[in-house]
Amino acid sequence: MPLKIDRLNLMLGLAIVLSVFSSSSVMAAKVSFKEFCPQFVGQWAGDAAKAGEIPRKVAVTGFCSHDQRQLILSVSIGTRAPFSETWWFREQGDQVLLTYYDGVAEDKQQVFSLYRQNGDYSLLGEGVVNARPALIQLLFDAQAQNQAGGWQWTQNIQYLDDDIDRYQLFRGIEMTPVAPSH
């Protein structure tokens, strides 16, 4: 009889654990670029900094093409480059091609997959950062506490040649609307 009770307790415990995991973790789902693009139209302001640096004030301007297949985010003021940064995202099939230009270095390109989870958008890709292979995440975290509908844009990396198995913050940009969007 004790064996049956132990087995029943084990099964009950597994059922509880599985129900907790299935209800609390919502899987990220791939989304279309047409859903993502119009969310970032308008003018934004906030602080930006790389990890360990002092934040600087920035302005971000977002343009989405009429067909919603291209998004340009221009980040200016307070960037390390003497010119603004241009982040040109464009839909390419079920992926997103990013071209980054800062007015100083050569253009950089990266291919990403676009996901949505709990109102946040995440672009995930594999590339090279600081001459090291890395997973790259551009996370646009919806700021629910901000009634104006802002975003926290973080640029995260996870080096593939490292034992650390989590993303590390590379840079963050706060985006609070300063002008009506759309």
Residue ranges: model-predicted function:
Residues 2-13:
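Bacterial N-terminal signal peptides that target proteins for export
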Residues 24-28:
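Sec/Tat signal peptide C-region and signal peptidase I cleavage site
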Residues 29, 113, 139-182:
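Edge beta-strand at a domain terminus
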Residues 56-95:
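N-terminal glycine/threonine-rich, aromatic-flanked beta-hairpin/loop signature
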